[in-house]
Every structure is written in C-alpha cells, then in structure tokens.
From Swiss-Prot:
Family: Belongs to the lyase 1 family. Argininosuccinate lyase subfamily.
The entry's keywords: Amino-acid biosynthesis, Arginine biosynthesis, Cytoplasm, Lyase
Record protein name field: Argininosuccinate lyase
Species of provenance: Methanocella arvoryzae (strain DSM 22066 / NBRC 105507 / MRE50)
GO MF annotations in UniProt: argininosuccinate lyase activity
PANTHER family listed in its UniProt record: ARGININOSUCCINATE LYASE
Pathway linked to the protein: Amino-acid biosynthesis; L-arginine biosynthesis; L-arginine from L-ornithine and carbamoyl phosphate: step 3/3
Short name of one Pfam family: ASL_C2
Biological processes per GO annotation: arginine biosynthetic process via ornithine; L-arginine biosynthetic process
Reactions catalysed according to its record: 2-(N(omega)-L-arginino)succinate = fumarate + L-arginine
C-alpha cells in the first residue's frame, strides 16, 4: 500500500515500507543525539539559501519559525520512528506546519548525505569539548591528591613486585601526565573534526550557487571540506576520535586496576568512599570496588567500539553507503562511556582515603632500597656498578636489612675485598637503607624527591591553566558562531507574519 504522506518514498517507491524493515534500518539513539545538530544545520542552510536568493525570504522566515517551534517541542515531538531518520522526521514535521510550497524548499541543494555528515561532526565536536573539560577535572583531582601526599612514602613496583621507594605524589603525577597527553591529543583531534561537509550534497556537490563558506562560519567550522566526495564519505575523524578515546580508556583502566588492588587487604593502601563502592548480597562484610571495576571493564567496550568502526569503514567504496549508519553509534557510545568513566574516576580520586602509615610501612618491604645501596657502594668505593649490583644481589638472598659487616662479607665473596676498606661506612649503609633518603636522592628531572615533585606539580598546574585557556577559546569561538546564526535567524524572522 502506498503511503502518500511519506515525502521521501512517495515518488520513486510505490509500496509502503514494512514495519520490520523500518525497525531494522532505524538508528533511534543516534538520531536523538543528532537532533540539536540537525536543527542548527537546517537553520544555517536556510539562512544561506535566502541570502543567495535560492529561496524567497518569506519562505525562509516561515521555515525558520517552524524550526524554532520544533526545537521548542523537542525531539519526542518529531516522532522519529515513523520516518527513516531524524532528518526526514524534522523535514516532514516542517512541511506539515508550513506547507510544501515553503517547507519543501529547505532541502534545496542538499542531500541527507552531507546533512548527516555535518550533524555528526557538530555533535562530535560538542562531545569532544565536553570530554576535554572532564579531563581537566580529573587532572585537577590527581594534582590535589599529589599535593596532599608529597611526603607519603610507598613502594614503587615493577612486574608488580616491590622495586624502589617512591611517594604517592610521584605515582599520581605519572597518571596526571598521561591524562595531560590525552588532553593534548583531543585538542589536536579538533582540526580533523571541525571542517564542514555541508554543500557536498549527495557526493558531487550541486548546481545551486551555495555559499559554503557562510554555512561553515555560521556553524562554527574552520572551513568547508574541499572535495565533495570526501565530504559525505569521510569517517576517518570517527576512527581518529575513537582511537584517542581508546587510549584514554586504557589510561583509566590502568589507574582503576591499581586502585582496585590497593583497596584489597593484601595491599591496604587506600579505602574507597562508600559512594563509589557496593556490598555483597550474601557476605555482609564486603565492600566491593564495583565502580572502578566497571571503569576497567568498560575500557574494553570502548576499544570494541573503536574496532567496530574500523571494521565497518574498511570495506566501503566511495562515496556514501548505508553501512556508515552503523559507525555513528560506535562514536556515540564511545563518548558516553569515556566521559562518564572520566567523571567517575575524578570523583573516586577526590573522595579516596589514603592509609599513609601502611604505605610507609611497606615502602621497604622486598628490599626496595637495594638499588641505593649499590649506588652508594659505587659512589664511595669507585667500584663498577655491575660489581656493586652483584654484591647487593648476594645480600638480597639473605634478606633486606644488611649491615656494613654483611656488605663486607658479600664483597669478599665477590671481589676478595671489603668495601669498608675502600670507603663505605656504616652511616652510608644506614642512610642508603632509609626510604626517604632514597627518595630525596632522586632529585633529577622526573624523580620523586620533594623539590622535584613540587616543581612538577607547579608545572602541571601552569599547563592546566594554558589548557583551560585553549578550551575556553574553542568554546568562545563556537558560541560566537552560534550567536551569529541566531542574529541571522532573527533578522529574517522579525516582522514576518
């Protein structure tokens, strides 16, 4: 049966689409996400059409007023499931409101191909800037924790074995550095997102005299894309964004994994706030780090969305294919998970309880000061490091609290000489065994010494201020573009009945 109200199918297709076909081809969550962006695109395109004399100003005014009403009513009012997608749902509601003679002109010189590509970029841009702001909050939380624990000793690990003494500040600053790089990667990604496909039409552009520079400017883009086929078919920006989010998720997962371990009885370094924990349905004593486990687990989900996007795009010929519809939800879910995970992690860090004494107590377990004892032997005796390494390795077989006599015995076994006769003293050995002395001696760039850590915190805070200024500039530029669009809309609708 023919559906004459379906403005898209009524011309070429005589039969109404089956319900199961409509359900199969629908992309409702992604369409709802794109709804605000589609209205922006419709407004900018309509303003440009009127400016270029392609449609009458009276028709443009009617269209813009109807779009304002649709925006006010919200996404639920357009009844997306009744149409192929949000784009046709909006256009159909528009035509129903103002008639086809006016409303039917809005799509002049435009295809859904360039329309949806533009909408995705606008929505992705908003999420990208939001994720950058979320990362700023997480970095701030990590720096605050580092500031509070500049002198909190703890064991550092390699292979998850006690390795050398460090501080909680030094450890948290490592994570802060990784999330700082994540911010830089996102800032860099904007240049690949912020270019406008609008005006590419189906793929070969259009015979209408469109002003693509104007629509790009009104929508906050840096410039129009200069190949119309690339404009409608390019999804490499999605591959790029999901890749960068996958890296963020890996960094989040590593931090979450540590915090889960540290909250166990075996480590006993931290306790999570009750807000970020759950209990057992059978074991009443349990306090489970479910939230952080989900942060860790969902990193795999985001990596999966990245791989799905790559796998879908890799086999597609230019230009547009409906397979691309399956890529957008991968981006949407990746943003949803990554943004929520970053926010959750920031909250967990802000409310964490650090068990300083337990960290300090375990900072020397596993003979973590062995490296400093070897270094002290080198500095005091002139022996090669590899020789000193062997001497201290002998001591490690016997435990981790050697006296000068113990070091002498091991050195006699190794080289036939006592290191005490070569310049090593009992005081030197005792200082080398002290975990705080170990930390303070590591004062070069990147080390855990107090002054070095304080300098790193200061450097990170300054960098965050610069990043905040960059983010503010990006948002301000976007807001100014939208204000320009609003002014154009008002100038065309004021005084029009």
């Amino acid at each position: 049966m023919e559906n004459k109200e379906d403005i898209l199918r009524r011309g070429r297709l005589a039969a109404e689409k089956k319900k199961e076909v409509g359900e199969f081809t629908a992309s409702i969550p992604a369409d709802r996400w794109l709804f605000p962006s589609d209205l922006l695109v419709d407004k900018a395109h309509t303003v440009m059409l009127a400016r270029q004399g392609i449609i009458a100003k009276e028709d443009a005014a009617a269209i813009l007023k109807a779009l304002a009403a649709i925006e006010h009513e919200g996404v639920d009012a357009v009844n997306i499931p009744a149409f192929e997608d949000v784009h046709m749902a909006i256009e159909s509601k528009l035509i129903k409101a103002v008639g086809e003679n006016a409303g039917g002109r809005m799509h002049s010189g435009r295809s859904r191909n360039d329309e949806v590509a533009t909408c995705i970029r606008i929505s992705a841009r908003k999420e990208l800037l939001g994720l950058m702001a979320d990362l700023q909050d997480l970095r701030s939380a990590l720096l605050a924790l580092a500031e509070e624990h500049k002198e909190t000793l703890m064991p550092g690990f390699t292979h998850l074995q006690h390795a050398q003494p460090t501080t909680l500040a030094h450890h948290m600053l490592a994570h802060a550095s990784s999330f700082g790089r994540d911010f830089e990667r996102l800032a860099d990604a904007l240049k690949f997102v912020n270019i406008s496909p609008l005006g590419s039409a189906a793929f070969a552009s259009t015979g209408y005299n469109l002003d693509r520079d104007l629509t790009a400017k009104l929508l906050g883009f840096d410039r129009p894309m200069d190949n119309s086929m690339d404009g409608v078919s390019a999804r490499d920006f999605i591959l790029d964004l999901t890749s960068r989010m996958a890296i963020i998720e890996v960094n989040l997962s590593r931090l979450a994994d540590e915090l889960v371990l540290w909250s166990t009885s075996e480590f006993g370094f931290i306790e999570l706030s009750d807000t970020y924990a759950s209990t057992s349905s059978i074991m009443p004593q349990k306090k489970n780090p479910d939230v952080l486990e989900l942060v860790r687990g969902r990193s795999g989900t985001v990596i999966g969305h990245m791989m799905a996007a790559f796998t879908i795009v890799k086999g597609l010929p230019y230009s547009y294919n409906s397979d691309l519809q399956e890529v957008t939800p991968q981006l949407l879910r990746a943003f949803e998970i990554t943004r929520s995970s970053v926010r959750i992690m920031a909250g967990a860090i802000q409310t964490i309880t650090v068990k300083k004494e337990e960290m300090r107590r375990k900072s020397t377990m596993g003979f973590t000061t062995a490296t400093e004892i070897a270094d002290t032997i080198v500095r005091s005796t002139g022996l090669p490091f590899r020789t000193a390494h062997g001497i201290v390795g002998r001591l490690a077989r016997e435990g981790g609290n050697p006296s000068l006599a113990d070091v002498d015995r091991a050195s006699v076994e190794m080289i036939g000489k006592k290191v005490s006769e070569m310049g090593l003293t009992e005081k030197m050995v005792e200082e080398a065994k002290d975990p705080w002395s170990n930390v303070e001696r590591r004062s070069i760039v990147g080390g855990p010494a107090l002054k070095t850590v304080e300098k790193k915190i200061s450097t990170e805070r300054k960098k965050m201020l610069l990043d905040a200024a960059l983010l503010s500039k990006m948002n301000d530029s976007l807001e100014e573009a939208y204000r320009s669009l609003d002014r154009e809309v008002r100038s065309m609708t004021e005084g029009q009945e």
